[in-house]
Amino acid sequence: MTNSNLRTENHFDYVKISIASPQRIMDWGQRTLPNGQVVGEVTKPETINYRTLKPEMDGLFCEKIFGPSKDWECHCGKYKRVRHRGIVCERCGVEVTESRVRRHRMGYIKLAAPVSHVWYLKGIPSYVAILLDIPLRDVEQIVYFNCYVVLDVGDHKDLKYKQLLTEDEWLEIEDEIYAEDSTIENEPFVGIGAEALKQLLEDLDLNQIAEELREEITNSKGQKRAKLIKRIRVIDNFIATNAKPEWMVLDAIPVIPPDLRPMVQLDGGRFATSDLNDLYRRVINRNNRLARLQEILAPEIIVRNEKRMLQEAVDALIDNGRRGRTVVGANNRALKSLSDIIEGKQGRFRQNLLGKRVDYSGRSVIVVGPKLKMHQCGLPKEMAIELFQPFVIHRLIRQNIVNNIKAAKKLIQKADDEVMQVLQEVIEGHPILLNRAPTLHRLGIQAFEPKLVGGRAIQLHPLVCPAFNADFDGDQMAVHVPLALEAQTEARMLMLASNNILSPATGEPIVTPSQDMVLGSYYLTALQPNFKKPNFGDNQRTYASLEDVIFAFEDKRVGLHEWVWLRFNGEVDDDEESKTPQETKELEDGSKLEIWNFRRDRFDSQNNLISRFILTTVGRVVMNHTIIDSVSKT
């Protein structure tokens, strides 16, 4: 940690998530004010006073615990303005500071009875069950007050350590222990609820168990061995992180900062509040009721029922619906617990931390762009003008079209031809990155040269779809603009779609035609047996070049699958042809005509080729012309 220019910067090597000890949970929420007063414990379920609309003291929005709700102003209003910074009001006990501290200052609730953490109890796998080597069903029976568990067998011969007993079984054993003729001196000790679970976890000697398990593994096979390995893996993790198993049972629960679970006043005077406040309120109410019952020495059955209800309230706060009935609010909607806020696609990690929106990026639906080159993509004008706006503004000012940024922005909003011309110049040679989620391999994000198109959809060449695993049934893709010259160079040299033809995983081509392209190629080159082949010399069906055939097709003088004779002096590759011509004719001028199945070759007396006519279809001519045209351009 270094201190420079009065700013403290933290340099981390890594972030680690581990179980928090009860003391650490208290430390998160407990603070000593400048006047020496210790605050942090939330003891009241109230949120705000309905008359004054100010937070209640020691409640879920308490200003003494979490900080003032207005900048530099205490609860009672005695101290206002920044000049009183750091002073603790002697009347209300609120520290005069910025209100933004309410975004990170935490509190805690001291529980009247230990409570099991639902993640470790009901998670898959259940770490509590694995550590104790007790089936999960039995652990739940203990935690939710259905069965007793033997913590100490004493002198009783029929009992075993960690054995489960029902209410009736324990009453029978009690009668046996306290009978007049009883010989039991050391009484067995049983427990129930999370307290018993905590006792069992405290009794574990992890190092000794690890040694015993390692010896047992050497002589075990099959399913038993797999179970032992699973258990030793959990134990080793506890040892490596210096975490104690009993920390899976909570003595205190943290209360997250109030600005992360806000309460907002609506127009009609009503309040909208975060679900967490309702869940915290349930916990505090039940905790306070349990503490009161313990104080007045209420019957055990009532106290036990209250402890079970406290356990269920904490379960709902941490992970609502994981066990038992889901807690619902108004309109029978399930309340969002801490787990719901963290997990899933809309959770804190994926939505806010990993999936942040970045500048110079956009998103739209993709449609097929068959007329594009492989390294090109169609970028909607509306999107391009927004993404490249700083570049366009710079060029407009440099070309003296406008004098300042404000005028440039006004001109851009009109989107006239002048702006579009400048935009065209800007995007010329400036690659953009296209990304399709999920990005499972490096070809999930590739660079393309943008081409301005109308509409609001991004056009994508069909050949690059396999790399993105994209199709055109409503898929969306993200656009990013590389800004630095180095980033643009890297995008052009390494990430351009035409440079990523082979799969990095297998080395095989990933750019392969499929679906429409294969079907189209087949239809174009298919031979129709029903069409009559013209005789050689038929002037209606004889053409001097590929272009002449295409012109005739465009004029609708010939159909796509009709046979034609075409003069073509290039090499012809035909698997169906035999090695020798069907017939050879000597012509009057001394030349020679070779008659093949699908071609007629004419040679002079020195055996030089004079002309070659091939019998083919219009579709095959179109296909060959397209290939020759594209190859000659590259």
UniProtKB/Swiss-Prot annotation:
Residues annotated for Zn(2+) binding in this entry: 74, 76, 89, 92
Molecular function per GO: DNA binding; DNA-directed RNA polymerase activity; magnesium ion binding; zinc ion binding
Q: Which leading EC class covers this enzyme?
A: transferase
Q: Which reaction does it catalyse?
A: RNA(n) + a ribonucleoside 5'-triphosphate = RNA(n+1) + diphosphate
Instruction: Relay the cofactor remark from the entry.
Output: Binds 1 Mg(2+) ion per subunit. Binds 1 Zn(2+) ion per subunit.
Arranged from A to Z, the UniProt key words for this protein are: DNA-directed RNA polymerase, Magnesium, Metal-binding, Nucleotidyltransferase, Transcription, Transferase, Zinc
Q: Which residues bind Mg(2+)?
A: 471, 473, 475
Q: Which InterPro entries match?
A: DNA-dir_RpoC1_gamma, DNA-dir_RpoC_beta_prime, RNA_pol_asu, RNA_pol_N, RNA_pol_Rpb1_1, RNA_pol_Rpb1_3, RNA_pol_Rpb1_3_sf, RNA_pol_Rpb1_clamp_domain
Its Enzyme Commission number(s) read: 2.7.7.6
For this protein, the record's SMART domains field holds: RPOLA_N (SM00663)
Q: Which GO terms describe its biological process?
A: DNA-templated transcription
A single GO cellular-component term on record: DNA-directed RNA polymerase complex
The cofactors named for this UniProt entry are:
Mg(2+); Zn(2+)
Q: How does it assemble?
A: In cyanobacteria the RNAP catalytic core is composed of 2 alpha, 1 beta, 1 beta', 1 gamma and 1 omega subunit. When a sigma factor is associated with the core the holoenzyme is formed, which can initiate transcription.
Instruction: Tell me, in a sentence or two, what this protein's role is.
Output: DNA-dependent RNA polymerase catalyzes the transcription of DNA into RNA using the four ribonucleoside triphosphates as substrates.
Family note: Belongs to the RNA polymerase beta' chain family. RpoC1 subfamily.
The protein, known as: DNA-directed RNA polymerase subunit gamma
What organism does the UniProt record list as the source? Prochlorococcus marinus (strain MIT 9515)
